[in-house]
A protein has these predicted regions:
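Short beta-strands and strand-loop turn motifs
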Residues: 9-10, 148
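Helix-loop-strand module that forms the ligand-binding subsite of alpha/beta enzymes
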Residues: 64-111
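Phosphate-binding/catalytic loops
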Residues: 97-172, 176-181
């Protein structure tokens, strides 16, 4: 078992523009909360499986296409994302496949995947589009919500950021969230 109980794995390639959205979310949690590791999952695939091993709970955040109605939408998957989602980058296997294999192997007790709808992926482009940046912020809020659910006590900068019970309508370009079971 790892020292820290929770891993936040960001996937993507920051040199492919919007594909780097998952990495941006992960970076927001680096050093932010004791008991939580922020992990660069690279471009995902089979390499995710050993990264998950030994954690009680893992959140995987990745750029995805075909999951939202508009760019910046955020979807929280309590079960592996559909295996027929179109790939949005050059992963050797999809996130859904990696999650399914990790669950089958018993690598981790609970895995939640957060997808950010990114639309087009542009090669050799740094930074994300403004609507995707809104999705990054919405995904950050979803990770904070999960950490509040999973941890006995709030930690670090999460202490003052407990998510509210009401649903807020996001401003244009700020992403919206929904849960798929």
């Amino acid at each position: 078992m790892r020292e820290n109980r929770i891993g936040i794995i960001g996937c993507g390639n920051p040199f492919m523009g919007n594909d780097g959205a998952g990495i941006l979310v992960m970076q927001l949690f680096e050093g932010r909360c004791p008991g939580v590791d922020a992990i660069d999952g690279g471009t995902g695939g089979f390499g995710l499986i050993p990264l998950m091993e030994g954690y009680e709970r893992v959140v995987i955040v990745d750029a995805m296409t075909g999951i939202g109605n508009r760019i910046g939408d955020v979807v929280v998957f309590a079960t592996p994302p559909s295996l027929d989602l179109p790939a949005c980058s050059l992963h050797d296997i999809g996130i859904g496949d990696a999650v399914a294999v990790a669950r089958e192997l018993g690598c981790v007790a609970e895995i939640v995947t957060i997808g950010i709808e990114v639309g087009d992926i542009r090669a050799f482009h740094r930074g994300v589009d403004p609507a995707v940046e809104g999705g990054v912020r919405a995904a950050e809020k979803e990770v904070v919500r999960l950490l509040w659910d999973w941890m006995d006590e709030p930690c670090g900068t999460l202490a003052g950021s407990k998510p509210g019970g009401g649903s807020e309508s996001p401003s244009p370009g700020q992403g919206s969230s929904r849960v798929r079971l």
